[in-house]
């Protein structure tokens, strides 16, 4: 990153931010799709039932905890990789 000039650093930062937003939107879309498909079964009303609301809450919490855990493991593996690269 130090080898880049200011303009290149700004461009790189913009690309990173765009990728992060794309990843966030993909995560959100997957969450909505999965929890809706798993929890919403009754289309006779325009309101969610208490059971559906509870299911969506549990589903979204579980999905987000899983995503957080995967992110933590990725960070741990990345840290190990960086340590191994520094030892060389």
Swiss-Prot record:
Alphabetical GO biological process terms: protein insertion into mitochondrial inner membrane
Motif Twin CX3C motif: where in chain: 35-59
One MF annotation (Gene Ontology) recorded for this entry: metal ion binding
Transmembrane segments annotated in the record for this chain: none
Topology term for the membrane: Peripheral membrane protein
Subcellular location field: Mitochondrion inner membrane
Keyword line: Chaperone, Disulfide bond, Membrane, Metal-binding, Mitochondrion, Mitochondrion inner membrane, Protein transport, Translocation, Transport, Zinc
Disulfide feature: 35-59, 39-55
GO cellular component labels: mitochondrial intermembrane space protein transporter complex; TIM22 mitochondrial import inner membrane insertion complex
Keyword ATP-binding applies: no
Keyword flag Disulfide bond: yes
Protein family (similarity comment): Belongs to the small Tim family.
Quaternary structure and interacting proteins, as annotated: Heterohexamer; composed of 3 copies of TIM9 and 3 copies of TIM10, named soluble 70 kDa complex. Associates with the TIM22 complex, whose core is composed of TIM22 and TIM54. Interacts with the transmembrane regions of multi-pass transmembrane proteins in transit.
Notes concerning its domains: The twin CX3C motif contains 4 conserved Cys residues that form 2 disulfide bonds in the mitochondrial intermembrane space. However, during the transit of TIM9 from cytoplasm into mitochondrion, the Cys residues probably coordinate zinc, thereby preventing folding and allowing its transfer across mitochondrial outer membrane.
Physiological role: Mitochondrial intermembrane chaperone that participates in the import and insertion of multi-pass transmembrane proteins into the mitochondrial inner membrane. Also required for the transfer of beta-barrel precursors from the TOM complex to the sorting and assembly machinery (SAM complex) of the outer membrane. Acts as a chaperone-like protein that protects the hydrophobic precursors from aggregation and guide them through the mitochondrial intermembrane space.
Name under which the protein is recorded: Mitochondrial import inner membrane translocase subunit TIM9
Upper lineage: Eukaryota, Fungi, Dikarya, Ascomycota, Saccharomycotina
């Amino acid at each position: 990153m130090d080898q880049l000039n200011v303009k290149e650093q700004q461009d790189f930062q913009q690309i990173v931010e765009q990728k992060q937003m794309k990843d966030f939107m993909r995560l959100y879309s997957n969450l909505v799709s999965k929890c809706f498909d798993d929890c919403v079964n009754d289309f006779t009303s325009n309101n969610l039932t208490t059971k559906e609301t509870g299911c969506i809450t549990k589903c979204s919490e579980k999905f987000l905890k899983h995503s957080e855990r995967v992110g933590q493991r990725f960070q741990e593996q990345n840290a190990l990789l960086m340590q191994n690269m520094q030892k060389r």
